Amino acid sequence: MKNLVKGIIRKAANVALDKTTPLDTNVAEITPYTFRKTEFPRKRINLLVPSVNPEHVFGGISTALKFFEELAAKTGYDRRIILVDSPPTEEARKKYGTDYTFLEPEQDSTDRAQIVPYSNRYGRQIGVSDKDIFMFTGWWTAHCAQEACEEFEKKEGIAPRPFINFIQDFEPGFYPWSTRYLLAEASYKNRYPQIAIFNTGLLRDYFKLNGFRFQHEYAFEPVLNASLKEELYKAGDTLDKKKQILLYGRPGTERNAFNLIVAALKKWVWMQKDIGEWEIYSAGEQHEDVDLGNGKVIHSVGKLTLKGYADILKESYAGISLMASPHPSYPPLEMSVFEVKVITNTFANKDLKDFNDNILSLDNISPNCVSARLMEICDGYTPKVPHRIVNKDYCENADIFSFISEIKELL
């Protein structure tokens, strides 16, 4: 009987070894692009972006589109937007249809402004000429374009014009040390000439500190959204503030450290003497409300309209906005000019303490430190705070891409 049991166990073990889990070796983002040679009469800037659907056009994509449109306008070059992740919705076609012609990858056209959906690209080729210039934002679009250009040069003998790499964060940091980390990093090291456009000088300096070099480098600085600026300039010499804390809350984006904020607040609610008088709101991404204990809850208001965002900025006394990245992110800057006393974090060479007096930039971002500093802020609450414009470059700069004339000479 004992030998029978041993035999059954050995057999079961062998079966388990035979049934190994299938490996998933695919990196979905890098489904290849394929180019075919075509003739085109003029220089054309090709922007590779995931999507132009309204629900996706904010933050990085919005900034890239703004630069792309200004670059095309000031150089006089033709425009083509290639959509690599999401096909355009009817709403997107309606929005862009007056200025752009929508084409399939197989179609050639001399229209001066084109949009080509290319998310469904297996076995499909896009026409490319020696006058095409590629601009990408997002490491996977850079990777795929760079590899496609290498294959195109081998096949047709046409080397690409300098790439425009629109860099809005250190993207390897979006992942653990892994395949995607290395692929993102490799996109900065491609052998072809690249013009790097950095979203902030802080980000450019971080790349330099870490040994990355490009043939040409430019940086632009953040500027306050025009609608927020209008609301800011309508405010008087003082702002009425509530006992209210505004969080930049994006649980779905790890680099915004939402769980760390929650951990700090769960300590703070037991430290603040007048805790019953305070309310906490989270803006940026819709999520369920979070119970902090001691009768306090984080109320999620999701993604607000610009008017709604301006209103909550005006009335909030304190804020927390974290970013585990060398990029400053916009919310702490926006909060600070609306006289919100905001806690943020340093990261490598990033330190926002000199932006204005409303920013508290912490080197130690542990929950104990954050909760202690938040209590100090809240203990100093006053219902009216003085308001004046101290960051005029941030609020009023109408020419953030002033270097475009130099880029034209490189293309």
Placement of each model-derived feature along the sequence:
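A charged, aromatic-enriched C-terminal amphipathic alpha-helix characteristic of glycosyltransferases
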Residues: 365, 379-411
